[in-house]
Amino acid sequence: MAKGIFNVPDVEHIGDILHYESLIKDNGGTQVRHFWNGEEGDECFIVFFAETEEKIKNIKSILENG
């Protein structure tokens, strides 16, 4: 298992985070956790796992572009 970490720089509400988590799961990621203090405008870190480093790279690309 490979681990990926994605930074969401400006979270307005939990829906923003759930959108990224759905993209991760829809593209083969598992065991998603996020770390956000709940403050509007603060950053959030999303930690996820996938079978290979290549899959992690693909998921990160999707998150950055979609």
Language model features with spans:
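Short glycine-/aliphatic-rich beta-strand segments at the starts of folded cytosolic domains
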Residues: 1-11
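Compositionally biased non-globular segments, especially hydrophobic aliphatic-rich helices
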Residues: 5, 53-55
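General helical structural elements
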Residues: 7, 37-38, 59
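Residue-level signal for functionally critical sites in structured catalytic/ligand-binding pockets
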Residues: 12, 31, 63
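Acidic, low-complexity, intrinsically disordered interaction modules
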Residues: 16-17, 21-53
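Short amphipathic alpha-helices in soluble, non-transmembrane regions
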Residues: 20-24, 56-66
